[in-house]
Amino acid sequence: MDSVHDMGGVDGFGKVEVEKNEPVFHAAWEGRVLAIQRAMAYGRAWNIDQSRFAQEQLPPITYLSATYYQRWLLGMEKSIIERGFATAEELKAGHATTPGKMLPRKLTVSAFQQRRRSFFRQQQAPALFKPGDRVRTRNIHPKTHTRLPGYARGKLGVVERCQGSG
């Protein structure tokens, strides 16, 4: 998707200030947002690319002015409403007014502990390329999420490593 989120190589945003001894979360609610995101993804409400796409659809001014976890929260709210897990009114009120829609799969503590160690996925099909292969990326403009940033489209490169497929 071509939108404001794809800022790789863009000038004019100034120096990135690194916070010394930066905590993982600046506020407790950020940790809860991460936990909800992980539970919803494990529960198959959505996947990581769908989560990113929801954030990429935020209005540019919102995307640029929100913090990292604010974008996650806004994207989750959109996805929760679109998928029928809650209504906008319920989110605003902070509680359900009708019985909720169940997730396809429930996250348990043991399942979380097993999954949190790695995001590695077994390769589902033979790799199309191998390290050392010369490749050219496509110059695409998809309407949904892509992992190919604008600055890398239509460019020549060499495969350095394969990390599986999914």
What is each of the regions a protein language model found here?
Residues K92-H145, A152:
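Mixed-charge, Lys/Arg-rich low-complexity intrinsically disordered regions
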Residues V10-M40, I80, F119-L128, H141-G166:
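Basic/aromatic-rich interaction segments and small domains that mediate binding to polyanionic partners
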Residues M1-G100:
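N-terminal intrinsically disordered, low-complexity, charge/repeat-rich segments that act as generic
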